[in-house]
Amino acid sequence: MSLLKFAPKVALLCCSAILSVSALSARTVTDDNGDRVEVPEKIERVVVANILPLAAALTAYTGDGSIVAGMHPASYSAAKNGLLGELFPEVLRADTSFIRGAALNVEALMALEPDLVLVNAPDRRMLEQVRSAGLAAYAVSPSKWHYDVVETYRGWTASLAKLFPEANGKGALIEARTREIESLVADRTKDIAEKDRARVLFIVRLDEKEIVTSGRNFFGEYWCRAAGAVNAAHDLEAENANARLSMESVYGYDPDVVILTNFTKAVPSDLATGKIPGQDWTPLKAVEENRVYKMPLGLYRTFTPGADTPLTLLWLAKTLYPARFEDVDLALETKRWYKEIVGVELTDAQVERMYSPDRAAAEGASQGVRSTQ
């Protein structure tokens, strides 16, 4: 037999071997939409599209920011202005050019050669765009657990455990510490009479054009319930960031406490000094009693689920009921969490910055990210 006749057979055998190895090195996981997704045995390059907190959650879970090949600009701004980029500077090398708001540039995405793309689960159009390009898209849901922040964080951690089994035991450690904090807060707030529970108004977005709160179908409802408080806007049924208020409605609620998220550039002093055009917040009880607070900015914006969720619950409970948590050293608990869960040791200055974020925390955070429902 001549070498020329033999060559095609060798090539065919080589191709078959390569395909066999490829098949053996792939595995199938089920995402939050129930879709089966084939991923490599070891995932090394991930693009986080429009499920914004996942860039930080992924980095914290794996302990490696270089795994994030691309992320949404709104995720990047949180990384740059919060602790993520400081603790994992390699994450700031991630590309952001593949997406603008809800518009995905498929060619730019493909150029990143991701092993996996994480997509907001309700965004079927974007999932289809990614999969049609031959890329593995895993749907991550922000609402499957009915906006229960801790349960959502648990669900996301379960997904990360499936996708990154090499981080053996990380999920169990996160769960143990989360339950510890949950139990502490629940035990210390369970005997508060209904009439004595703090009435809290979350301000998700705020500027001269709009006031957006959390009604009963968004994360603010969970935060209030878990911390032993009452959501002042519980009567609003609008889901997600669609519960818009007039100033008259705010006066009607007259909450005991106002919590500003990091999806707005507003800071507590803006409400006290009338810096928001066309709005007067000064008559509110919360403003008069100096009980307007800005949520922490840790690895990501803490109103949403993420790697800082248990710490955020502890911060909120201590902020609402300082006497009941007087013995809790939040700085110490924060350092402990980051050392055990994230694998880094925070300085006093880093802890201070986490709990006193400035306007930059909201940079780029208000843009829409879903291409469709």
Predicted regions and their residues:
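Bacterial N-terminal signal peptides
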Residues: 9-20
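Sec/Tat signal peptide C-region and signal peptidase I cleavage site
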Residues: 21-25
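Short helix-initiation/N-cap motifs at beta->coil->alpha
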Residues: 32, 93-106, 237-247
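Extracytoplasmic substrate-binding proteins
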Residues: 36, 126-209, 233-234, 287-288, ...
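Structural recognition of the beta-strand scaffold that forms the well-ordered cores
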Residues: 47-49, 69-72, 116-120, 137-140, ...
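A short, structured surface patch at a secondary-structure boundary
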Residues: 48-111, 116, 232
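Proline-aspartate-enriched helix->loop->beta-strand connector
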Residues: 99-101, 106-122, 246-263
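Alpha-helical, coiled-coil/dimerization segments enriched in small aliphatic residues
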Residues: 214-242
